[in-house]
């Protein structure tokens, strides 16, 4: 049975462009037309409009206000912490792959009193300099020479930053949740946005020490419940890679990420959180060979995604080798069965949309 696309269009517009701002065209709809659907009138069908609206980014003015809200929270914390904390951003807002209901913007406060350090990786790299450039060798040696053990207690520092931030934010904003393990939730009222404040320490990876490229710096988030730091993440590298690959793909990568997020959100069989998160959708889309879709019309991107999900479901070897955008973990290593159930639901949604496109093409042909 065909979906109620008018209702779906209404919902996706409400969550991505609540202020009804005039939106610009996507790169993938400025070409002459779809290779699969040569009749241009198909683009005015309800199913095509739903696809287009689901691929578009959130209105720029709305996204800008999300950043303004994060800046306001940062200003309060900066006044309290001074120069002892650096501030960064992570999340899908920084790549413009967010949808309104998953308006993912994290304010990361990072202690600069200490950092984690990949000592073993550094020594291993310096013992095999034949594969390194001269500049990389010099950078590694400099990091080794400049290293000195931290005399304080890193966990105590992070605990103090977290506690002080809880006090500052609770006295500034009406709605604050300090019970979350990895972050402090803050509801900013003007502009009205939800902000998560994460407390972390830097992690100096070998790639960072070789290049001094800030995007190669990792972070380890302080967990309030365990009183420990979590495994290393590379959010800044993920942001850079998605932004760069989107340019290489002629702006199509982000179209696919947003589309799959919206399809997941509209799927009645998948919970809002679920096993497949933004993290996994980013990785799935990022993994697709750019050459397969870099010049395609937006309607053809649906088939590309369907083929990818089908391959993930049927080919274990292929599935097991899909890594996160930062390249640090295999996304189907854990909870694979649950994730595959949701991938199957997403695949069915795409199959249904493709069938409706073909049926509509016959009607207007």
Curated annotation (Swiss-Prot):
Q: List the disulfide bonds.
A: none
Could you tell me the superkingdom of the organism this chain comes from? Bacteria
Provide the E.C. number(s) assigned to this enzyme: 2.7.7.65
Q: Keyword annotations for this protein?
A: Antiviral defense, GTP-binding, Nucleotide-binding, Nucleotidyltransferase, Transferase
Is Membrane included in the keywords of this UniProt record? no
What GO biological process terms are annotated to this protein in UniProt?
defense response to virus
Q: Which GO terms describe its molecular function?
A: diguanylate cyclase activity; GTP binding
Catalyses which reaction? 2 GTP = 3',3'-c-di-GMP + 2 diphosphate
Q: What is the effect of changing residue 233 to A/N/S?
A: Reduced efficiency of c-di-GMP synthesis, makes small amounts of other cyclic-di-NMPs
Q: Which family does it belong to?
A: Belongs to the CD-NTase family. E subfamily.
Q: What else is known?
A: Bacteria with this enzyme do not have other c-di-GMP synthase enzymes (no GGDEF or EAL-domain containing proteins), suggesting this second messenger has been co-opted for CBASS signaling via STING activation.
Chain's role: Cyclic nucleotide synthase (second messenger synthase) of a CBASS antivirus system. CBASS (cyclic oligonucleotide-based antiphage signaling system) provides immunity against bacteriophage. The CD-NTase protein synthesizes cyclic nucleotides in response to infection; these serve as specific second messenger signals. The signals activate a diverse range of effectors, leading to bacterial cell death and thus abortive phage infection. A type I-D(GG) CBASS system.
User: What is the protein named?
Assistant: c-di-GMP synthase
Per the UniProt record, the source organism is: Flavobacteriaceae sp. genome_bin_11
Q: Which gene encodes it?
A: cdnE
């Amino acid at each position: 049975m065909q979906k109620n696309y008018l209702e779906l269009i209404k919902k996706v517009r409400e969550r991505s462009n609540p202020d009804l701002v005039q939106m610009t065209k996507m790169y993938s709809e400025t070409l002459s037309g779809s290779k699969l659907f040569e009749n241009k009138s198909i683009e005015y069908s309800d199913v095509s409009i739903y696809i287009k609206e689901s691929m578009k980014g959130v209105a720029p003015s709305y996204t800008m206000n999300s950043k303004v809200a994060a800046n306001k929270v940062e200003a309060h914390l900066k006044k309290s912490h001074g120069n002892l904390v650096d501030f960064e951003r992570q999340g899908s807002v920084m790549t413009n792959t967010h949808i309104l209901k998953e308006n993912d913007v994290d304010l990361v406060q990072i202690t600069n009193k200490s950092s984690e350090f990949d000592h073993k990786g550094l020594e291993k790299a310096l013992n095999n300099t034949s594969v390194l450039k001269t500049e990389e060798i010099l950078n590694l040696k400099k990091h080794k020479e400049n290293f000195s053990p931290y005399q304080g207690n890193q966990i105590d520092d992070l605990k103090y930053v977290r506690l002080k931030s809880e006090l500052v934010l609770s006295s500034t904003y009406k709605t604050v949740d300090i019970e979350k393990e990895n972050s402090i939730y803050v509801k900013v009222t003007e502009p009205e946005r939800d902000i998560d404040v994460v407390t972390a320490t830097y992690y100096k990876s070998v790639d960072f020490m070789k290049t001094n490229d800030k995007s190669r710096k990792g972070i380890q988030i302080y967990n309030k419940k365990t009183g420990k730091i979590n495994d290393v993440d590379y959010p800044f590298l993920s942001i850079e890679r998605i932004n760069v690959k989107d340019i290489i793909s002629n702006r199509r990568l982000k179209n696919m990420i947003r589309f799959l997020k919206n399809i997941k959100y509209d799927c009645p069989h998948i919970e809002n959180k679920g096993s497949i998160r933004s993290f996994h959708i980013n990785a799935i889309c990022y993994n697709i060979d750019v050459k397969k879709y870099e010049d395609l019309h937006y309607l053809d991107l649906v088939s590309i995604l369907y083929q990818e999900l089908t391959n993930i479901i049927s080919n274990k070897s292929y599935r097991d080798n899909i890594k996160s955008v930062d390249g640090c973990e295999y996304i189907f290593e854990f909870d694979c069965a649950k994730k595959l159930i949701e991938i199957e639901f997403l695949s069915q949604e795409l199959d249904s949309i493709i069938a409706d496109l073909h049926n509509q093409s016959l009607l207007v042909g």
